[in-house]
Amino acid sequence: MHIPRKTTAIIGSGGKSTLLRALAEELATGGAANAEFIAAETATDKPRVGTSPNKDCPTEKSAGDKPSVDGGELSTRRPAAKENAIVEEPRRAHVIVATSTKMFVPDWCPVLLDPTMDEVRLALSTHPIVCVGRIHRPTGKLDAPRMAFSELEAAADYLLVEADGAKMLPLKAHAEHEPMIPECAKRTVCVVGIDGVGSPISQACHRAERFAQLADASTADAVTPEMVARVLEAESLHDMVLINKVESDNDRRVAERIAALCTTPVVAGSLWRKEFRCLR
């Protein structure tokens, strides 16, 4: 998953906040996400790394110094340096995380509440990641920052914005006012929780009636891979899909079926296990 510099919006359901943290930490340390989330494939997965035709899913050959697959796990090892050679460490990037709607207050990075831009820049001089926003007093959640996202974007290498809500459910459809994608966003990643497939729409989906309408189904119907793809394609709010919680052979088959019906790049895997591969 190529993450361009400046603003990326994260929408959907089933792992947005987890992806926000994973990307922020990788980007800040100059790790895998600094250019790509590389697919971690098992020894039996096909196609192997090095054969992906998708420019957003770089091959092992094209990834250069990026992580490669070693024994089925994500590897960030570099070739052994020559004796006495100076190894240049990757530059630490500055990352701002925020929301355009509301999200739980992060406990894994400094949180700046209603700061000035000078305070944001000062915090970034000592911390690679900062979160910017305001407290929404009725809920205690973090609300959108007062300043424009274009101002925040100018202060950091990366701005990651959680631009959606899903009531902690694995799937969702969007109301007319959703998602709240910043105008400056260069990429929009839609997260899908595969654990919603097989459950009734009424139980697995935020805005179940809207999901059922787009899927040409009833809210009592069980979610199918075809329904998930149909809703994604009907809404067309993203330029990349991340299918999360793919942790079994059956999960992989379901994810592959969804990907086959999508027209945008699709990455599938597990944020918890830190294992992903590009499906299209």
Cite the ranges covered by each PLM segment.
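Walker A (P-loop) phosphate-binding motif
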Residues: H2-L27
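P-loop/Walker-type NTP enzyme "switch/lid" segment
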Residues: D118-E151, S202
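Canonical P-loop GTPase G-domain recognition
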Residues: L261-R277
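Phosphate-binding/switch loop-helix module in NTP-utilizing enzymes
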Residues: H136-A173
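N-terminal phosphate/diphosphate-binding loop that engages ATP/GTP or pyrophosphate donors
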Residues: E26-A32, A40, E88-C131
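Inter-motif core of Ras-like GTPase G domains
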Residues: H177-G196
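G-domain G4 guanine-recognition motif of GTPases
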Residues: G193-I194, S218, M240-D251, G269-K274
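Intrinsically disordered, low-complexity terminal tails and inter-domain linkers enriched
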Residues: A28-A93, T126
